[in-house]
């Protein structure tokens, strides 16, 4: 492999000739070659956006020449366009402040910026620290990138997918609004409801969690940039943080703003804990929905069999004709991972010793993983299961007609104890409720049929 010599404050490093990074990135790559988890590209792009804004503001403040600022901007735009993805090789498992990833971006933008300047015949040299990182520290840039990446991932990907999923649930609720089925509580038969009513409950769950996510995202709008090393803003213009946040807001069209207290912004990540808590709530809801569908589709002959799910693939390598609830299984595994990620994020966020939290990479890695998994899981479940979900009305009607819990409709007419006697007699002697009621001498056939009407039970009139 052809290499070139790059230098930092610790000495010389051999760097691959065709790579844009420098000595500090190379050191990190060699010192922290751990696992397979690379720094998420969402963070890389957030960094590029931040460095572009910082260069623009430094130019406005007279801290950076127009030639250097423009070259950094050009290079950052190339990164944002995905042209240099393979020049960001670092792993999540590095310094807890994310310094190596900050320097990775600084070095790539400096070298690429210098190449662009040379192409224009300009005798100007960009330095990764003095120019690209001017007025900044890893301690305020990395948390800024964390918030940008998290907010964008939620706003651009998860929330639109969640809205699509929710809309289809509403459509299914309307489609099955007239299908009266047996209700179940405690895994036991209960009074009836419509399948549409049951699904409407699922839709409302997602409406609430969507609202929780949106409300929590307000805190992610606050950016740490301008705090520099410990929150005081040393080596930065007093207006730098505010101006950079405004530039990022203008560039993205999203309501980013400068954090009111930079000391908090560097040492605490309670905003991400709070927002991920909403993601955990979404995960809990999705587990329940996927699990209900899985159980209601169980069978086809030995289970509940009230729902029919699409047959997407053979279900067994040994049992022919088997169709498994694979989309439910995938989604429930995803939600389990998200709930586990929440524990990691909460613990990591507690490690804000003095002026700086030093678990930043693992916090944002898990946050972005949760968001990606939920987005992909929602879309796949929607496309491969939810849209094609059908009601097995024959089985639904059979279960409803055999239910002893229809006896609940008799409570207002003959009292709880008499109704219970009818249910027990029917169960013990294998009778229908009507037969048990008539044999008990409590009701005539006409009275029973007037009082026990599932359609009236799902839409009571008082």
Curated annotation (Swiss-Prot):
Residues marked Important for catalytic activity (site): 329
Reactions catalysed according to its record: (S)-malate = fumarate + H2O
Pfam families: FumaraseC_C, Lyase_1
GO cellular component: cytoplasm
Subcellular location: Cytoplasm
One record GO biological process: fumarate metabolic process
Molecular function GO labels: fumarate hydratase activity
Protein residues bound to substrate: 97-99, 127-130, 137-139, 185, 317, 322-324
InterPro entries (UniProt xref): Fum_hydII, Fumarase/histidase_N, Fumarase_C_C, Fumarate_lyase_CS, Fumarate_lyase_fam, Fumarate_lyase_N, L-Aspartase-like
EC number: 4.2.1.2
SUPFAM superfamilies for the chain: L-aspartase-like (SSF48557)
Keywords: Cytoplasm, Lyase, Tricarboxylic acid cycle
Pathways per UniProt: Carbohydrate metabolism; tricarboxylic acid cycle; (S)-malate from fumarate: step 1/1
Active site: 186 (proton donor/acceptor), 316
Top-level EC class: lyase
UniProt record similarity statement: Belongs to the class-II fumarase/aspartase family. Fumarase subfamily.
Function: Involved in the TCA cycle. Catalyzes the stereospecific interconversion of fumarate to L-malate.
PANTHER family, per the entry: ASPARTATEAMMONIA/ARGININOSUCCINATE/ADENYLOSUCCINATE LYASE, FUMARATE HYDRATASE, MITOCHONDRIAL
Other notes: There are 2 substrate-binding sites: the catalytic A site, and the non-catalytic B site that may play a role in the transfer of substrate or product between the active site and the solvent. Alternatively, the B site may bind allosteric effectors.
Subunit details: Homotetramer.
Protein name in the entry: Fumarate hydratase class II
Gene expressing this chain: fumC
